[in-house]
Amino acid sequence: MTSYNPASPDFPFTLGIEEEYQVVDPQTRELRSYITQILDRGKMILREQIKPELHQSMVEVGTHPCRTIQEARAEVVRLRSIIAGLARQHGLTIISAGTHPISSWMSQEITPFERYKGVVEEMQQLALQLLIFGMHVHVGMPDDEVAIELMNVARYFLPHILALSTSSPFWMGRNTGFKSYRSALFANFPRTGIPPSFHSAAEFHNYVNLLIRTNCIDDAKKIYWDLRPHPYFGTLEFRVCDAATRVDECIALAALMQALTVKLHLMFSENTTFRVYRRAVIMENKWRAQRWGLDGKLIDFGKRAEVDARALMYELVAFVDEVLDELGSRQEVEYLLKIAEGGSSADRQLAVFRETNDLNAVVDNLIVETLEGVPAYQA
């Protein structure tokens, strides 16, 4: 029988968080293509926990697998502290948000690795302009069949999670009108967005093998869905979120994804069903989430009615309530209600801009919020 207690040696639902940070010059407020210099020292300290991304102005970090959300918080704080400290040694800093408010993709340098050269060769301008930053959460799975079963039903909640995480309202100096413009940009890539449902793990693997055999992809990691079974880690990977600005937001979202996975697995173990909805209808909600975030309405497909997004966040927290105490994540998940009431990072960015009419002030505030509660790194 599957254990839902993180202290149990049989607990499968471990947690891992990957964050993509912006490398920023605090004087000009612009992105800086400087990751190679940061990596030189970062690899010595963090080893496999730090890696470059397509653009030289981005750095990706990942926690070790964690059993509890408290372990994950400690890891995220440590990683933000180290990367900010390494950046500071070069007169730079970091931001965690889905897009940079003012910098242009045309000014960015591409990381000179063969992998990224291949991406640019295939995707051309789509790759060059993909100057976006996300947060990925891995939840451990007992096996492939469970991963597919849970992916099928968890897809329904992806727009809700996105609405809470929105942090990309600005793009190249313009107010886009979106709460998550990152999502709109990423939709230009193939194999993105809400995944289809699969009847079994075998059907999923057959699909992946077909793509590889027909030269669509050379690696299953080039399936970029908002939720996917990770091809190597044995996890279900939630990829829908904009990069979370505050540590508290990052941890609340990760705690929700772990709790949601456990809740859905518990329902399966009790022979309680959760309807598998068509991709097309979930995409309607994703559009609303990326456009209006928490200020909009999402469709409750069970009720066949629109519901205020903020009200649905209360329902979502109530839905996972019964597993929170065993997971030890009640405080972290209930922080989502503060986000629902007070707004996401996108809402705060827009508020700063309304008050100041100055995108530099938005950048300055993002720098402050990214490092709230993060101690200065001591080399």
UniProtKB/Swiss-Prot annotation:
It catalyses: L-cysteine + L-glutamate + ATP = gamma-L-glutamyl-L-cysteine + ADP + phosphate + H(+). This is Putative glutamate--cysteine ligase 2. Belongs to the glutamate--cysteine ligase type 2 family. YbdK subfamily. The keyword DNA-binding does not apply. GO terms for biological process: modified amino acid biosynthetic process. Keywords: ATP-binding, Ligase, Nucleotide-binding. One of its GO terms (molecular function) is glutamate-cysteine ligase activity. It comes from Roseiflexus sp. (strain RS-1). Its EC number is 6.3.2.2.
